[in-house]
């Protein structure tokens, strides 16, 4: 399963030292930049978070790699 990475909110005290965490899903902007439609993502069971507005390059790269792997599998068949 593919998991998105998002930034943590800034805390007043350094309770959590990590800058990133695993998100609930990919944003619509990230899907669009990687070439996925919402229907394709749902068929592949890629999690989507409609509330997120940000787009992180790391997540776009993950989605592009996933799309390339799917195209290679289709060509092999």
UniProtKB/Swiss-Prot annotation:
Keyword Ribonucleoprotein: yes
Pfam family, one: Ribosomal_L13e
Entry's Gene Ontology molecular function annotations: structural constituent of ribosome
Family matches, as PROSITE patterns: RIBOSOMAL_L13E (PS01104)
Taxonomic superkingdom: Archaea
Keyword Ribosomal protein in annotation: yes
Matches recorded under HAMAP family: Ribosomal_eL13
Protein name per its UniProtKB record: Large ribosomal subunit protein eL13
Gene: rpl13e
